[in-house]
Amino acid sequence: MSKAELKDFTFKSRHIGPTNEDEALMLQHLGYENAEEFISSVIPNEIFDSENNGVSIPDGCDQNKALTEINIISKKNVEHRSLIGLGYHSTVIPPVIQRNVLENPNWYTAYTPYQAEISQGRLEALFNFQTLISELTGLPISNASLLDEATAAAEAISLSLTVRKNKNANKFLVDQEILPQTLDVLKTRCEPLGISLEMFDNNNFEIDKNVFGILIQLPGKNGRIWDPTKIINDAHKCNAIVTIAIDPLAQVLIKPMGEFGADIVVGSAQRFGVPIAFGGPHAAFFATKEIYKRQIPGRIVGQSVDVEGNQALRLALQTREQHIRRDKATSNICTAQVLLAVLSSFYAVHHGPKGLKQIAENVVKYRSNFESILMNLEYPIEKYSAFDSVDVYCSEASEVIQLASEEGYNLRVLPIGSDFENAKGFGVTFDELTCDEEIYKLHQILAQVKGKKTHDLSNFIFENASLIDIPLREKSWLEQSVFNQYQSETDLMRYIHCLVSKDFSLVQGMIPLGSCTMKLNAAAELLPIEWREFSSIHPFAPHTQLTGFHEIINDLENWLSALTGFQGVSLQPNAGSQGEFAGLLVIRSWHQSLGEGHRNICLIPTSAHGTNPASAVMSGFKVVSVKCDEYGNVDLEDLKNKSKIHSKNLAALMVTYPSTHGVFEPNIREMCQVIHQEGGQVYLDGANLNAQVGICRPGSYGIDVCHLNLHKTFSIPHGGGGPGVGPIAVADHLVPYLPGHSIIKCGGQKAISAVSAAPFGSAGILPISWMYIRMMGSDGLRKASSIAILSANYLAKRLDPYYPVLFKDPNGLVAHECILDLRPLKSQLGIEVEDVAKRLMDYGFHAPTISWPVAGTLMVEPTESESLPELDRFCDAMIGIREEIEQIKLGKIDPINNPLKQSPHTLKTVTSDDWDRPYSRKEAAYPLPDQEKYKFWPSVSRINNAYGDRNLICSCPSVQDLEDINSV
């Protein structure tokens, strides 16, 4: 066998689905002799980087080499036991959950559950999460997660502003004990909207009618807890909305905040079984009153019924969201933290209410006994009721912190943000991992600093303690069966498997969602995130302990800069929506630095992602729409006209490239020039960057700032709806304005304040993208983009005779995705795009993106990871559906009672004793021949969406209890 005939076993060949032979066949099908000729026909010549010039990315390598390299890097982190607290706590992820959820591609490769009939498993897990949060907080409405606690608090301000009774009120009061990173994000979110933030002391609380809301932190950053009843009542007398940021483990013991009268309760579920991971990702929560259900941000899982009357779950009240309401949306949140919420929900299922209470009581016990030890050693402490933390201000603080570090413990440096050399005090926060031996060790450290003899604590009796100064939980909670019947590992393992078997993920087949880039998430990429050297690190740990993380971050920033043609990158935004927000704020700050803060017009094409206008409004801009022409391109004349009209106030153009219509617009460079001539900046939505990596670089054709979706282009899994990472890359003149942080130094010299709670966002999953880029290398990344474009064009060519491709470039080609026009089917035969989407489930596929960016269409994106047989299987499915439609057209199939209108077909339906449909069971269930070997079954029939919104149920009782009720 010659060298040329040897199989390529590099990672590149593992990641890219089509073989070289497949690639040649696809090129031949399209009429091209080689890939270079094809790509040069797709990419406009003026932006095509034909030689991959200037991209300084290492050559690709195999998985073992990359794992060895990143393992060496991980060892550069110093793994100390963190007692820092401040919203980040050590916890134990039960192995049954780690093995069966976190490490299970059935869970982490799924997409947001828009196609509910094939998403019932994670919808139930999220329904359990919402039930948990509602039970914790005492509020009836909870969402299915937000990005972090700071973002959730900021969203609470937005809701409070929206529903305020005094529309002239513009002040928001914040507890002075708020977590500093939360305050940082609140400042970022409030300033563009003209909201005045003022701090308050709960011992000296004053409020007036110019205040539309207040935020209380319980416990405070020092661990203190207190009864908020009077302040809540005083706030309500002035019609102010009350938000409480609560520690969920403390809330296990304390009377639910909703019973105190809180209107909104937010927090982070990180303590419920999710590693610290250098700041994230973690699932935040947001609960509120029934009256605000249509203003709540993020996604809500609600109960409905399918066409057969069976209970089913779905995403409810979607008309609130950015993909529908655009600049009028309640929030710009798109990606949230579904996988992390699922982990936390199973953590609660695993422990049950008794187990959670035991963990919380242990924290209180250890904190109380540690306080006694401090007093016995004559450390000066302020006596107050606290949940998990003790702050000590003393002259020996630096010595205590240093000695603790030498013994493997990180304490909180006071004041927060100081170096230990300048410490005025130290703080200790206890958590689920605290044990007797840890208290003994801390006692030895503290006694040594005081020069006192260490007493033998081996016989020390740890006295139980309870919280004081605040009412405790009295009513039973989490009585739903799901939280009380799976404490056995066998039962929990089976329950987890039962749920995930209802879900369609990349394990079952291609997910051809346009604008979503559902590519392979390789196992080797995911392995490092569970290593303790990455997963246990606190985001505010000493700089000297973080060398490994800083190397990962520096590598990624340099690689992403090289790939995009920009000069600076911030990894802080923890979702694409937050990347948009950060990028626009950077532009806004740059204008302000030039004395042009009046520039507030943001031009956005009508085809843009819904997050674009929502983010623009959040950033303080006014949105002006730009038309698109009949070919799907931005109307250049309309762009010029709008730019001239608004020239004095023009701030930015937001554009997606390739366009959301699936084509490389030939005049992108001219569009940038038009905006620059009028003093504006150009923002690129990087959702479609998978068609550009290694082929063209936005920074080289006129873009000023763009965000990148690491959970799309750079292989971080979607997790069923998060986590995501949305870094921004900027041109040289914008580098000084990259986001900073109040505790950890990062960002530019003139940095905007933080957009995420952690300084580097969801840093715990950055090793995934590091591994992807390291293994693919420059050539592999370029090849991936080329194959992604080739696969989309192959699908478009095969399907065009059956479903016209709506937009093509002058060469008849598309970018990495294409839009199939189904509108004639509705006008002629009453076939809805939803009918085709649901019928695809019977064929064994997740539907493409439906009715976006054009109503009545399907947007298809295959990615480079899908093999030619899988592409052909999808084409066969779509052609098979078209043939069924033809049978309806010819009158051979009933226009209502047919496989499309009745889809999807469940196993229960096709095995029922009653079958009165004019088509066979086989036609319903096995439309393709190979499906008899393997079949993925939807677990429910088509869901009644309207019923679910009219009869909103988004928390307890659990699904099992509801089934029990209905069976009576």
Curated annotation (Swiss-Prot):
Alphabetical UniProt keywords: Oxidoreductase, Pyridoxal phosphate
EC numbers: 1.4.4.2
Ranges that cross the membrane: none
Chemical reaction(s) catalysed: N(6)-[(R)-lipoyl]-L-lysyl-[glycine-cleavage complex H protein] + glycine + H(+) = N(6)-[(R)-S(8)-aminomethyldihydrolipoyl]-L-lysyl-[glycine-cleavage complex H protein] + CO2
Record-level Gene Ontology MF annotations: glycine binding; glycine dehydrogenase (decarboxylating) activity; pyridoxal phosphate binding
Cofactor: pyridoxal 5'-phosphate
Residues the record lists as N6-(pyridoxal phosphate)lysine modifications: 712
Single GO biological process annotation from the record: glycine decarboxylation via glycine cleavage system
A GO CC term assigned to this protein in UniProt: glycine cleavage complex
Keyword field contains Cell inner membrane: no
Keyword Oxidoreductase: yes
InterPro entries on file: GcvP (IPR003437), GDC-P_C (IPR049316), GDC-P_N (IPR049315), GDC_P (IPR020581), PyrdxlP-dep_Trfase (IPR015424), PyrdxlP-dep_Trfase_major (IPR015421), PyrdxlP-dep_Trfase_small (IPR015422)
Gene3D superfamilies: Aspartate Aminotransferase, domain 1, Type I PLP-dependent aspartate aminotransferase-like (Major domain)
Top-level EC class: oxidoreductase
Family: Belongs to the GcvP family.
Reported function: The glycine cleavage system catalyzes the degradation of glycine. The P protein binds the alpha-amino group of glycine through its pyridoxal phosphate cofactor; CO(2) is released and the remaining methylamine moiety is then transferred to the lipoamide cofactor of the H protein.
Subunit architecture: The glycine cleavage system is composed of four proteins: P, T, L and H.
Protein name (database record): Glycine dehydrogenase (decarboxylating)
